[in-house]
């Protein structure tokens, strides 16, 4: 290296770095103690008692324009009116950025579902999620006892009438799906509106023991 005088531009020194010995590794006595992970001091039972509900993930799956979002927000409204605590994750909000070309959920979705469920809230997803493996990843993350799978199986003509994105326009490849083997419920907007479906889904949550039965009255 060289050192240059900034006023005269004259070289005033030069040298070479030959290297040095690497610092010795920590011995066991010198190694700093690992920080212990801090865990929540609020148990799931305490949250359930305070909120009057058990945290869970409600997953609405179905083809595009089947009415998943309408049902999700109607269910959120119904639960709110019953003094329950719920939130919706919808394809049009910022949390949904990163949906894969095959319709798979963003990579962070299982962790989001688990954390909100652990907090004792009811989180309602309105993703198409056509792949069965994608939905099973969410089930594995939150646990089967806290995962409620709803198949929104609205008929093609009704989906076409609701289609705002041109998914069913001529020339488009019809979307496909791997329907659930054993969903907690199969619903549609063929003969019922979203509010009526939401009422039935509250009963599903009761049956699963996630809500007290009196709240559907």
Task: Describe the residue ranges of each PLM region.
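Conserved substrate/cofactor phosphate-moiety recognition/catalytic segment
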Residues: 66-118
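Glycine-rich phosphate-binding loop used to anchor ATP phosphates in small-molecule kinases
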Residues: 97-156, 168-170
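C-terminal effector modules of nucleic-acid-centric enzymes and ribosome-associated factors
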Residues: 1-54
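Hydrophobic anchor at the beta1->P-loop junction of P-loop NTPases
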Residues: 58-60
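Hydrophobic, well-ordered secondary-structure elements that form the walls
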Residues: 9, 124, 159
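Small-molecule kinase domains that catalyze NTP-dependent phosphoryl transfer to phosphate-bearing small molecules
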Residues: 153-217
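P-loop (Walker A) phosphate-binding loop of NTP-binding proteins
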Residues: 63
């Amino acid at each position: 290296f060289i050192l240059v005088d900034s006023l005269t531009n004259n070289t005033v020194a030069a040298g070479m770095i030959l290297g040095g010995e690497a610092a010795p590794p920590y011995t066991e006595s010198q190694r700093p103690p690992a920080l212990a992970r801090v865990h929540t001091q609020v148990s799931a039972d305490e949250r359930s008692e305070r909120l009057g509900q058990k945290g869970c993930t409600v997953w609405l799956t179905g083809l595009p324009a089947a009415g998943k979002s309408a049902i999700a927000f109607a269910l959120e409204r119904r639960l709110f009116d019953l003094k329950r605590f719920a939130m919706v994750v919808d394809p049009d909000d910022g949390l949904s950025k990163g949906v894969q070309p095959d319709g798979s959920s963003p990579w962070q979705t299982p962790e989001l579902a688990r954390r909100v469920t652990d907090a004792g809230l009811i989180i309602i997803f309105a993703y198409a999620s056509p792949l069965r493996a994608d939905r099973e990843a969410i089930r594995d993350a939150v646990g089967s006892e806290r995962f409620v799978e709803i198949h929104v199986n609205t008929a093609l003509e009704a989906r076409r009438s609701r289609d705002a994105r041109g998914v069913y326009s001529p020339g488009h490849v019809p979307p496909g799906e791997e329907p659930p083997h054993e969903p907690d419920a199969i619903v549609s907007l063929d003969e019922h509106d979203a509010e009526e479906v939401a009422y039935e889904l509250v009963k599903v949550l009761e049956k699963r023991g996630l809500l007290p039965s009196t709240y559907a009255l």
